[in-house]
Curated annotation (Swiss-Prot):
This is WD repeat-containing protein 55 homolog. Keywords: Repeat, WD repeat. Pfam families: WDR55 (PF24796). The keyword Nucleus does not apply. The lineage of its organism: Eukaryota, Metazoa, Ecdysozoa, Arthropoda, Hexapoda. It comes from Drosophila ananassae.
Length: 481
């Protein structure tokens, strides 16, 4: 999960909401079903009279009158002619219906009527649905894999995303709004690949695994470039790229190592943590290396001095993720209790502020801008929050299951997430560039903000629906006057 500090200025192009493919198919199916129902209702209009049979009431009247004047010796001279006319009428009606239906039956009628509805629909709700269906995509479609996705990483220069899986493979996809294309599947590890990262120049792909190895793959040749076999004594959980040559790794036992791609062995090793290292992070100058861990410590290492810088006071919760904000002046850490701890840069012994965050555990954090972060966890929602002062901005996107990985591309416009459902979804977060700075004394509704759906969300807000209705009524009143 690689963080980026470069953000692109928003263009003037019209932004559109992403529409879930399943939602589109569902809407089309409902419209087709409605049209089919109307077509069936029209077919029901072929009654007994159209088929040549007399109406039921007339039959009763005729029977009643014939009973009164019944003559057993009389001859029914019209009976044969009546039956013949009835058979001819039935055959003519059946032929007419067959010609109307054609070889495909009612499906042809549904198709024709649906096309007409697209052009001539007067119902405002249906027109809105059709307009939404015709909108172009603002983000690539979902990627679905057979295996569990453990981590994802965007290429820094190309439209490529790497997906690490639990069986040790890495899938390289070329993504676009029109569709995604699998470039290649690289079999790199014998056990679960836990972290995947590109170097800053994008030439190399680094992976670490439960098999205790670190692999370096050349992106140009797509072949193995270097193997650090048994890089740790324990399973490696996380990896962080500092630049095109340096990277750091942390394992399940708390050991942190710094590596240089130009050497065969690690540069230095430090063991100051007693539990799993959950994330590694460094500042832009690469002078400090920070590590969060499951034992509730924030540990900072001095890279040039190759020694411990400071270790925080213990917390009664797991520290899972972190990010740097406000011009490298603030460090924010997410915890297993859904809290966010803020530290002044350099003062990592104890937090200066604590934000309530969300009620569910926070396991992932990605800086989108210098003041906006996206956090995710077990509840399956990706939420945006403003840092210093803290504000919930709303829901960026959703998954049906807990979210496992999160990353943002180099421009800061596209966010990708994967869940326990083996799916990877994309969210266009370009709109964050237009968010203004939040003031400390600004009034806000915390309850509403936490449930507010942002433009990239696949859900809509109830208030938006009623606002559109009110606007429509105002427009109608203006037209009437």
């Amino acid at each position: 999960m690689h963080t980026h500090n470069h953000f692109k200025t928003p263009s003037d192009a019209e932004e559109v909401d992403d529409l879930d493919d399943e939602m589109v198919m569902g809407v089309i199916a409902e419209i087709e079903q409605e049209v089919l129902f109307e077509s069936d209702s029209d077919d029901d209009g072929f009654g007994a009279e159209q088929l040549g049979a007399p109406p039921p009431d007339d039959d009763n009247d005729q029977i009643s009158s014939s009973d009164d004047s019944f003559d057993p010796n009389a001859e029914d001279s019209d009976s044969d002619d009546s039956m013949q006319h009835e058979e001819q009428a039935q055959a003519t009606s059946a032929k007419r219906r067959k010609d109307d239906d054609g070889p495909s039956g009612s499906n042809r009628d549904v198709e024709t009527n649906f096309d007409l509805d697209l052009e001539d629909e007067t119902d405002e709700t249906v027109r809105a649905i059709i307009a939404a269906i015709k909108k172009p995509r603002s983000a690539p479609p979902e990627i679905k894999l057979e295996d569990f996705v453990t981590d994802i990483s965007f290429h820094p220069e190309r439209n490529i995303i790497a997906l690490a899986t639990i069986i040790g493979d890495v899938h390289l996809y070329e993504y676009a709004n029109e569709g995604n294309k699998l470039i290649r599947t690289i079999e790199v590890h014998s056990k679960a690949c836990r972290d995947v990262e590109f170097t800053e120049d994008g030439r190399n792909l680094l992976t670490c695994s439960k098999d205790k190895c670190v692999m370096v793959t050349d992106m140009e040749t797509e072949k193995l470039k270097k193997l650090y076999e048994t890089a740790h004594d324990d399973a490696i959980n996380t990896l962080h790229v500092l630049n095109e040559n340096l990277f750091a790794t942390g394992d399940d036992a708390g050991t942190v190592k710094l590596w240089d791609l130009r050497t065969k062995q690690h540069v230095f090793e430090l063991k100051q943590i007693d539990d799993q290292v959950t994330q590694l992070l460094s500042n832009e100058q690469n002078t400090l290396l920070l590590a969060t861990s499951a034992d509730g410590y924030l540990t900072t290492f001095n890279i040039p001095g190759r020694k411990l810088y400071v270790q925080s006071e213990p917390y009664e919760e797991e520290l899972n993720c972190m990010g740097i904000y406000r011009g490298d002046s603030k460090l924010v850490v997410g915890t297993s209790k859904g809290k966010l701890y803020s530290y002044n840069w350099g003062s990592f012994g104890y937090h200066c502020d604590m934000y309530p965050g969300i009620k569910s555990p926070i396991s992932l954090m990605i800086p989108i801008t210098d003041r906006i972060a996206c956090v995710a966890g077990e509840d399956g929602n990706i939420r945006a929050c403003h840092i210093t002062p803290y504000r919930n901005l709303g829901v960026v996107g959703q998954h049906n299951m807990p979210i496992e990985a999160l990353d943002v591309n180099s421009t800061g416009e596209l966010l990708a997430s994967s869940s326990h459902n083996n799916d990877v979804r994309f969210w266009n977060v370009k709109y964050f560039e237009d968010f203004g700075d939040i003031k400390y004394n600004e009034k806000h509704n915390a309850y509403k903000e936490q449930r507010h759906n942002l433009p990239s969300s696949k859900c809509t807000n109830t208030g938006d629906f009623f606002a559109d209705l009110a606007k429509q009524e105002d427009d109608e009143d203006d037209d009437a006057t």
